[in-house]
Amino acid sequence: MAPADPELREIVREMNRSKLAEMFTKNGKEPLHAEGEIFPSAVLPAIASSRSGERRVFPMKWGFSGPKGLLINARAETAAEKETFREAWAKHRCVIPASWYYEWEHDEKKKAGRKYALRPEKEGLIWLAGLYRMENSLPVFVILTRPADDGILWMHDRMPVMLPENKVNEWITPGNNPAQTIQTCLTRVRWEQAV
C-alpha cells in the first residue's frame, strides 16, 4: 500500500492528532507520514466505528500477532469461521484508505517477479476492508482478501477486498451483515508496473 495521494493527507493528519497516536509513539512506533510504500507492522490510519457509533479515524498497526509472526491478511471466505478472526468479523471491522496496493508477479520458477501498483478501475482512493482487535491496549488490523479477478490471475491468485466508498459506513457498523457488504466489493483493477 502507498498512501502518497494528496487525498489521504487529511486522513493521516487526523490520525496523528489522536490520543492513540501518542500511545503508539510511546511504544516505539512512529506516526504515519503521507507518502512512501507501507509495510506490515506500520501504523496506518484506519476508519472504524467509535464506541458512540461515529465514523472516526484511528491509528492501527498492520498485523495481528501470531505464533509464527504477523498475520497481515485474512481470507474473506473463512474469516467468520476462524477463531483468530471470528470476533473481529462480527464486531470490529475497519477500512484502510490507500492510493494503490502493490503486488508482485508470481510464477512457478521464482518466488516473486516484477512489482505492480494496482487500484480500482473507476475509483480514486482504495477502501480496503479490514478486521481489528486490541493487543497490549493498542488496535491492530488485518486486511481481508478474496480470490483475484480473472484480469490479474497471471499476477497473483488473491487480492484485497476493496469496498466502494459508499459502503464504508455499512462495513464498519457493528450489527450489519459483513458477508452481504462484501458482495458489493470492487473487483476490476487497473495496474501499472511500479519502480
Place the predicted regions along the sequence by residue:
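Short linear sequence motif anchored by a di-proline
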Residues: M1-V195
